[in-house]
Amino acid sequence: MYNHKTVEKKWQKYWAEHDTFKTGNDPKKKNYYALDMFPFPSGKGLHVGHPEGYTATDIISRMKRAQGYNVLHPMGWDAFGLPTEQYALKTGEDPEKVTKENIANFKKQLNKLGFSYDWDREVTTSDPNYYKWTQWVFEQMYKKGLAYEAEVPVNWSPDLGTVVANEEIVDGKTERGGYPVYRRNMRQWMLKMTAYADRLLEDLDDLDWPEPVKEMQRNWIGRSEGAQVTFKVKDSDKTFDVFTTRPDTLFGVSYTVLAPESKLVQEITTPEQKAAVDSYIKKIESKSDLERTDLNKDKTGVFTGAYAINPVNGKEVPVWISDYVLASYGTGAVMAVPAHDDRDYAFATKFGLPINRVIEGGDLEKEAFTGNGKHINSDFLDGLDNEEAKKRMIEWLEDHNAGQKKVNYKLRDWDFSRQRYWGEPIPVIHWEDGTTSLVPEDELPLRLPHATDIKPSGTPESPLANLTDWVNVVDKNGRKGKRETNTMPNWAGSSWYYLRYIDPHNDKELADYDLLKKWLPVDLYIGGAEHAVRHLLYARFWHKVLYDLGVVPTKEPFQRLYNQGLILKNHEKMSKSKGNVVNPDDVIDEYGADSLRMYEMFMGPLDASIDWDDNGPASTKKFLDRVWRLFVNDLDLKAIPQERIVDKNDGELDKVYAETVKKVTEDFDALHFNTAISQMMVFINAAQKAKTIPREYAEGFVKLLAPVAPHMMEEIWQVFGHDESISYAKWPEYDPAKLVESTVEIMVQVNGKLRGKFKAAKDSAKDALEKEALSLDHVQKFLDGKDVKKVIVIPNKIVNIVAK
């Protein structure tokens, strides 16, 4: 009997002792980089959802090694961040100690699953030797003007005691913990991601990524073409610009709206409206951007008392303020055309503002008309369709110095400051004379000091502000300064970790350029779709900055991306609070790591979300036990069943073996593991029915199954008499000629009625088929006492005997 507990331990020990999965560097071989999104090492450890993506990259890595590639398949830890700090605050433990313990537990769990990681390349984002280079990248951005300080409206979470980025807010609450978010102005470090908006957008087209992820990034970047139009404020020298994607509707403007926080609001509000305006601003000042836009179902606003002049026809239109206009998007002002915009229509209807039709079509009594149509009431645009009218209006605006063609983006610069302890220190010093300087490169890493009190201060400072010995500095000229006390967000270290795996022990540079050239871009990156507009966008941005600096040789980091689905329990996401977490350690103890790996790959398509079945691993174990019994003599576990596995080939399994090698290889490459495993089951069914199994096919099959069930296949490989690991045994090939049936079934009819059938070699001669048909006992019965008048032979199909 196969004992998974002893066999799995044996091979895990063997792989570790022999450095089996050390990254190859044979210059004659091609290179393949298979990457997992590295985990945050939480105290909860792994649940069965984690190994799904990890098993997929492991199968590919193992196949590529067997196909003769140098394979880079590393693992590391996204170790900084809020969850560890929250846990440390709750328990009073040191976050560094907590992190180390969690990593040790995660690593033990991963090794029990038999993943073929090169542990020599392990990285941890909270290790000073690692974050030295995170800080170095920040310094290069600072020198290029891509990292800057600004007083900006931020998403402040009092419960977390820190700012969170737009990308970290889900449905108006913090993604981590689901806490409310409020708007406030704070001094923050920003990274100028907007400088890369066009490239981040355009280069998506070259990537082999799931279309929904690319679409989410396109929408997040939100490029829109239109015009910037200048409105003058009546009886004033003030002006304001609006960005619009519909300059063709300028004749239909019936009011304008400013962002409540716009400085202009205070300057133009009339005395009669001042109280109402101030009251409104106070009411909405703590709302987050999302609450004001996407989640804002009810339109609110106040008239300022001021009017603006429409530049195209000189008409006066009222100036309102409303929370749906953001100071941070576009120009912080909009022109409203209620007849042809749904949001403007709702606002105008609520506040009784005019609705001026300028395009034919629709019923304005019921709703805005947003489609294409002929322009009316629009002077020189009358009769034109939307696109022609847009072009003509932009020409008019430019000719009259009233506006210009403009491209706008929804993307904002990245808010890079966190008011927390457990993150990378920002290597900046603020001097008493008002200047700012970087910590010299040769003094990096700027280490995170040990602190016993890491409670958030509730102010724009992090707990580091309390460590005065660390904060206060004096330069050689006696000038006093203070270190930056905000830390970087946990997205910083994960924005470039895939580069460090390539050269993890380099203390002279982030990574050697020639090595980066050899391995980049990452060939396959597997992880959750929830990272579409955070990690994946941030990493692309950092990579492009590093490309411009000449640090990396490619424009993009990840050539092929794949999102695995969720493994659910009782149709819900697994979580401790729901009590529905399945621990992989328990499954491994009972059924073995190979059974768990195989079940997770066999559940369904890799990108589908599927419900966990507690009996699933038992069924894959049953299949693996069948494989074991077929190839290993149960009485002598070191021998093969000689009478079944032979050196001769009678051809019986030729076709199914060729089909299996072809399908498994192609399906693995396409990440269709469930159908590859189905085909292996087809082969085993055929092999069990066959009189004998050619040794070549038995060994070939073991190589095919090894990436999925590596422990058992290593053991069988050894039973077959091989001394070395199966990991580098050459991947099987097949003879395409054998995909075609070598035998066919011939139907035999007597006077048009089916009376028998037999197997014959494909394309047998007509006379041979006739002879065989006439000799069949069952056919003879129907020919008794009759004369055969004629025999019609259709090769490979039918022999029809006419007898009277």
UniProtKB/Swiss-Prot annotation:
HAMAP family: Leu_tRNA_synth_B. The keyword S-adenosyl-L-methionine does not apply. It is found in: Cytoplasm. Its EC number is 6.1.1.4. ATP binds at residue 576. The gene is leuS. PANTHER family: LEUCINE--TRNA LIGASE, MITOCHONDRIAL, LEUCYL-TRNA SYNTHETASE. InterPro entries: aa-tRNA-synth_I_CS, aa-tRNA-synth_Ia, Leu-tRNA-ligase, Leu_tRNA-synth_edit, M/V/L/I-tRNA-synth_anticd-bd, Methionyl/Leucyl_tRNA_Synth, Rossmann-like_a/b/a_fold, tRNAsynth_Ia_anticodon-bd. Belongs to the class-I aminoacyl-tRNA synthetase family. A motif ('KMSKS' region) lies at residues 573-577. Keywords: Aminoacyl-tRNA synthetase, ATP-binding, Cytoplasm, Ligase, Nucleotide-binding, Protein biosynthesis. PROSITE patterns: AA_TRNA_LIGASE_I. It comes from Lactobacillus gasseri (strain ATCC 33323 / DSM 20243 / BCRC 14619 / CIP 102991 / JCM 1131 / KCTC 3163 / NCIMB 11718 / NCTC 13722 / AM63). CDD domains: Anticodon_Ia_Leu_BEm, LeuRS_core. This is Leucine--tRNA ligase. One of its GO terms (molecular function) is aminoacyl-tRNA deacylase activity.
